[in-house]
Amino acid sequence: MKEFKIGLLLLTLIIAMLYFTEKFTSNNDIKPVRNLAYESNEELKPYINKFFRDLNNHGINKSIPKDFIFKFSDLESNKTTSHYHGVSLGHDDDDKVEIYINKNSWSSFNKTQRYYIVYHELSHDILNLDDLSENEANYGKIMYPSISKYDNLKMNDFVKNMKDLFKSL
């Protein structure tokens, strides 16, 4: 019984250490992303407005939270986010949206990819959805994690996948 209690105590300590290490690391990773951000409302606003219109058209009544940040950021300048196209920081917090889009990715993306990245990141923060696994069956879906692979998809593909996502909720 004593060995069980010691094992349980060690397991609890390990879990606590992992939790606080992740929490501390995540906060340190976020600061540079915020510092590298800049205003981009005019370019992103039409995509954001379309997302909320599409939600409403599919019977999903979500409003824009008061704490709403959606900006471009030089994510490639930060070692921990250099390979990200976008970062969503308001997942599981319905009162907050905090999203940063890699400006270089945005510049290289076609129109369809731009819609995918905006809907993908907003689906994390507004709908609290997780990424899908990166396998062939999920290719084309909004929550697929590799938007850069969507350079051959057209707006019709996006519209179909957006409707499929919203109907599944």
Where are these regions (language model features)?
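Active-site scaffold of zinc-dependent metalloenzymes
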Residues: 82-111, 125, 140-148
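Hydrophobic membrane-insertion alpha-helices, especially the h-region
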Residues: 8-19
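Signal peptide cleavage region of secreted peptide precursors
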Residues: 19-30, 129
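Short alpha-helical catalytic segment bearing the HExxH-like zincin motif
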Residues: 113-122
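Auxiliary, metal-adjacent structural segments of Zn-dependent hydrolase domains
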Residues: 44-92
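Catalytic Zn2+-binding segment of zinc metalloproteases
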Residues: 122-138
